[in-house]
């Protein structure tokens, strides 16, 4: 059975909330880093999210893939931009990155369908 990528982010949210409550200083610092990194400067936020997706594939983090696919889509990334980024991740990560790139593409398809109101 194929993973439900939107479902994965939904499943993680309560656990992330618990983590924020249990380690508030660490999570506030992490949030501050994320905000600083994602602020548009030389690269816009969309580009940074697409880069983060490529890194997520290269480091083989399914949870990261789910969150960064959604963020890239929400920032206006296109399927072609995501595919080009996945190609770069595959180039750098070889075989295992091919498998995680397929995860990212499945996540993109599901989040894109959800955004347009389709049930996946």
What are these regions (language model features)?
Residues 1-47, 99-120:
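Acidic, glycine/proline-rich low-complexity segments that act as flexible tails and inter-domain linkers
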Residues 30, 34, 50-57, 85-90, ...:
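Short alpha-helical scaffolding segments that buttress acidic/His motifs in well-ordered protein cores
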Residues 36-39, 70, 74, 91:
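General structural signal for alpha-helix termini and helix-helix connectors
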Residues 45-50, 79-85:
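Alpha-helical scaffolds flanking conserved acidic
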Residues 61-64:
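Short cysteine clusters
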Residues 67-79, 105:
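Iron-sulfur (Fe-S) cluster-binding segments and ferredoxin-like electron-carrier domains
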Residues 83-109:
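C-terminal structural segments of small proteins and small subunits
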């Amino acid at each position: 059975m194929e993973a439900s990528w939107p479902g994965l982010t939904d499943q993680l949210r309560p656990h992330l909330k618990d983590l924020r409550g249990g380690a508030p200083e660490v999570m506030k610092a992490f949030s501050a880093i994320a905000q600083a990194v994602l602020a548009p400067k030389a690269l816009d936020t969309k580009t940074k999210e697409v880069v983060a997706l490529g890194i997520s594939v290269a480091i083989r983090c399914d949870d990261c893939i789910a969150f960064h696919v959604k963020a890239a889509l929400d920032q206006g990334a296109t399927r072609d931009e995501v595919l080009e980024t996945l190609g770069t991740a595959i180039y750098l990560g070889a075989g295992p990155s091919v498998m995680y790139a397929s995860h990212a593409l499945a996540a993109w398809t599901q989040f894109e369908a959800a955004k347009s109101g389709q049930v996946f």
